[in-house]
Amino acid sequence: MVAGRPILRKPDDRRLQVAVSQVSGARSGTDRSVPLDLGFLSLSSPMPYTPIVATLGYVLSPDRSEVLMIHRNARPDDQHLGKYNGLGGKMEPGEDIAACMRREILEEAGITCESMSLRGTLNWPGFGKQGEDWLGFIFLIDRYAGMPLQANAEGTLEWVALQRLMTLPMWEGDRHFLPLVFDDDPRPFHGVMPYKDGRMQSWSFSRL
């Protein structure tokens, strides 16, 4: 800092520089090229990762022997057509992730969450129909109020025995993380599962 003014550091050679032509006078017709530092537009800066943020919830029956699943069989153009999945959807502006989960369960199943816990987070690069990235917050709902709907606009709702869950048609990646949702380890898991052309490419996770 010199006399209250910041010291401007010279950009390195990796910074983007462009030449701007200036006319030195209307009558002279001569040009002078002046280097313009646009270091703040450095080409080496990566684009920010902006996945779609969503929730995915699994509702347990009162005796904890069954889980409420949606069979996506209503829309022919559904990316999930024919598969079983938990309930959930995209987070909306103005709500936190827990509020998003409660809203989605109410909208999709007609019940109110009374007790739930965050079981994990999952980063799904490339999972979307057009290759969009998704970031999911996965909840287990162990107490609710109301009577679940039998169906919604996406498909039918079915109580499935936990022992039979892995026999259902589902995304191949779900078979890897679902055991972590229902096991006895109290620690949430945090995983990454890249997809390409609808197929899981890899899977890793940690627990804290």
Where are these regions (language model features)?
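A conserved beta-turn-beta hairpin within the catalytic core of GNAT-like acetyltransferases
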Residues: 77-82
